[in-house]
Every structure is written in C-alpha cells, then in structure tokens.
C-alpha cells in the first residue's frame, strides 16, 4: 500500500480544508513546489494534487503549479484532480508530465465521459468518488446526489479505470480516522483498485486499513496529518512495506 501525500492548491498556495469547506482552510505553504520536494525527499512514491479552485470553477485554475511540480519530478507518479471536465484538460496535464488525472464531478453527472477518457488516455484515468453517508457528492462537495458510491463504482469496471479515490467527506480533514468498513466494502465490491482518502490521523489508521485485509486497497492519501506532524511519510511507508498482518 502506498502512502500518498496530498497537496491541495487554493489561490496558488498549499492549503487543507475541513470537510471540503473553502471558507475553513488552513494555509500550510505559499510554495507548493517546495512542499512537494519535502514529501519526495521524505520517500513518497506518488503525489496527490488537488486544484480546489478548479473543482469549484469547473476548469483548471492552479495548472501552472501542477506543471511546475510535474516538471521537477518527471519520474514521480502524480495524480491531479479538481476541474477536470474535458478531454482537452486531460491532454494538457498528460503533456505536462502528470501520470494520472482524477475525474470527479463529471464522472457522476456524465459517466460516459469516463469511458471516453479511458479510451483516449488508457491507464491514466482515476475516478474520484466523494461520499456523504454512502451517497456521491459533486461540485467541490457542494451537492449530494442520490447515487450510491458502490453502484457507480461498478459502472466503471468495464471502462478501464486505473483506480478509484474514495473520500468520506465527514472524515476529511478531521483527523479522526478514515471510514475503513466502507473502504473495504468498496474494494471488495469492485475489481477496480481503491485509494483511501479522508481522516487519516496517525500510524494506527494506516494499520487499520492494512488490517482490513482488502488487497484492492492500494493506497492511502494523507494531508493534514503529515502537515501537522501526527504522521511521518517515511515511517508510514516503511510500515506498509514491512507489514506482515
């Protein structure tokens, strides 16, 4: 299982939100590129970037920062989400050196777009499913749909999606642990690998994900915990690498 540091971009700075509320943000750095350097030097093997302004505006806003990070680390897998709603945007990021794009809102509102994107950019498409009480939320979490996460995930199985990033909104940024039972259920209900996100606080939460014994859970995204120092990236990755269960 990979430990994947999150860099959330708002107005060019690296921030963390609580439960997806733009008005409840903490700025951790005004230099996201050096923040990326910190996590890479700490031994991370993948980065998770989110264009928060893009998620709300429906198009990339912090694209220059994303490109700068991708150019600095050409061999590092980088996934970007937020405002990805056209094939042109995906092409822009792929050309910039980003390895994976995360389709969120558009995957819920136009699931056929996912199939189209997978066909155009095989192996590069991740679907981001953000949920509240098991139902999918969209538009920067401002809207909650009547669509159930597991039902939607199954729909993407035939499309060639490389992973699903599953975020439990109630847990995100709260440092109270992630929703292990639901993450496990999702990983077992679909053949698509799952990356857990939201609420990871410390090594105990990483252990809880590993203890779930769901091979489909391939990664854990962590944000506030690594910024506030309750989780160390290198230590957590070593723990995953050496886990015997």
Swiss-Prot record:
Localization terms from the record: Cytoplasm
NCBIfam families, per database record: 1-(5-phosphoribosyl)-5-[(5-phosphoribosylamino)methylideneamino]imidazole-4-carboxamide isomerase
Protein name, per record: 1-(5-phosphoribosyl)-5-[(5-phosphoribosylamino)methylideneamino] imidazole-4-carboxamide isomerase
Pfam family, one: His_biosynth
Pathway field: Amino-acid biosynthesis; L-histidine biosynthesis; L-histidine from 5-phospho-alpha-D-ribose 1-diphosphate: step 4/9
Predominant subcellular localization, coarse grouping: cytoplasm
PANTHER family, per the entry: 1-(5-PHOSPHORIBOSYL)-5-[(5-PHOSPHORIBOSYLAMINO)METHYLIDENEAMINO] IMIDAZOLE-4-CARBOXAMIDE ISOMERASE
Residue ranges crossing the lipid bilayer per the database entry: none
EC number: 5.3.1.16
Any single Gene Ontology cellular-component annotation: cytoplasm
Reaction catalyzed: 1-(5-phospho-beta-D-ribosyl)-5-[(5-phospho-beta-D-ribosylamino)methylideneamino]imidazole-4-carboxamide = 5-[(5-phospho-1-deoxy-D-ribulos-1-ylimino)methylamino]-1-(5-phospho-beta-D-ribosyl)imidazole-4-carboxamide
Keyword annotations: Amino-acid biosynthesis, Cytoplasm, Histidine biosynthesis, Isomerase
BP GO terms, sorted: L-histidine biosynthetic process; L-tryptophan biosynthetic process
Gene3D superfamilies recorded: Aldolase class I
Organism field: Pseudomonas entomophila (strain L48)
Family, similarity comment: Belongs to the HisA/HisF family.
GO MF annotation list: 1-(5-phosphoribosyl)-5-[(5-phosphoribosylamino)methylideneamino]imidazole-4-carboxamide isomerase activity
Active site: 8 (proton acceptor), 130 (proton donor)
Keyword Cytoplasm included in the entry's annotation: yes
